[in-house]
Design a protein with these regions (language model features):
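Bacterial N-terminal signal peptides
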Residues: 1-7
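N-terminal signal peptide c-region/cleavage motif recognized by signal peptidases
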Residues: 9-11
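N-terminal, motif-rich segments that launch catalysis or mediate targeting to/interaction with membranes
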Residues: 13-152, 159-288
């Protein structure tokens, strides 16, 4: 069973574009007015042309675009940043420190955006937060910190970005479900279950906002990125992986209507938590 209140109904890109946009729109709703102006000012300096416009919802997809922009060329950005989007906590022997490469420190005078490739989403959120709240961080690096945070806070809430069953976070598990195209388990959690919420990120975010209570906000704002990763891991262990049926003779997992229903409930919960927590991060780091 999911730990949610009764108000809640039952190529790696965590959440896909729509999911990240939903998280950003929820977060924007909870921003202090002065903080929202500072966010807008930082994002307005983005000259990368990797996303359309400079809204929070658009920029929440920037980190994926940045990672993939040179994927078919020299792969510099791809190889440097791809592991920053997840933390592969092993399902059978969970160890966050091991999944985070023993938490390597940034080399002296190295900005977080140029940090080691072997690092995890938990550490990168902490590093980019430290830069964002430091007014002495260079303007360009501060904008990069914001762009990464808009995305990575969403990533750590996708259960299959915080767990691994020796299957690349579900990418090697073939699945199908009634009325849905066959695919892999990771893609279902990234994209397909989000699509079942509705095609329009704006309307989905408004619907989820209507279900978030004051007690939800108070509870969800507690904890650290490491806590969020562990929370996502246990959700993956209970639902994403834990509720899978046995594979059929061809190695495919045929998901039941009940599995899809529980997955949708989990996705709604995680998108909402991510939005509330992203707002808390930005309000804390940009309030000064």
């Amino acid at each position: 069973m999911l730990c949610a209140s009764a108000a809640w109904p039952p190529l790696v890109r965590a959440w896909g574009d729509e999911g990240h946009q939903i998280v950003a729109l929820i977060a924007q709703h909870y921003l202090d007015a002065r903080v929202e102006l500072r966010v807008q000012a930082l994002l307005a300096s983005d000259r990368s042309a990797l996303v359309s416009g400079s809204s929070m919802a658009s920029e929440a997809t920037w980190a994926d675009r940045y990672r993939d922009a040179d994927r078919d060329a020299d792969r510099r950005h791809y190889e440097q940043t791809r592991q920053w989007h997840y933390v592969d906590i092993e399902l059978s022997s969970p160890n966050l420190a091991r999944a985070c490469f023993a938490h390597p420190a940034l080399p002296p005078a190295t900005p977080a955006s140029a940090g080691p490739a072997e690092d995890c989403v938990v550490d990168k959120i902490d590093q980019f937060e430290a830069e964002l709240r430091n007014a002495r961080t260079s303007p360009d690096e501060r904008r990069l910190a914001l762009q990464f945070l808009l995305h990575l806070v969403g990533d750590v809430h996708q259960p299959l970005h915080a767990s691994d069953d020796r299957d690349h976070g579900g990418n090697r598990k073939r699945v199908s479900a009634p009325g849905m195209h066959a695919g892999n388990l990771h893609h279902y959690w990234d994209t397909e279950f989000v699509r079942l919420l509705g095609e329009d990120a704006q309307s989905v975010s408004q619907r989820l906002l209507g279900r978030i209570s004051a007690s939800d906000i108070e509870a969800w704002q507690r904890g650290s990125p490491a806590d969020w990763a562990r929370e996502s891991f246990w959700l993956a262990k209970a639902v994403s992986y834990g509720a899978l049926p046995p594979a059929d003779g061809g190695g495919r997992y045929r998901l039941s209507v009940g599995y899809v229903r529980d997955a949708i409930s989990a996705v709604q919960l995680q998108l909402s938590r991510a939005g509330v927590r992203l707002a808390a991060v930005l309000n804390r780091d940009l309030r000064q």
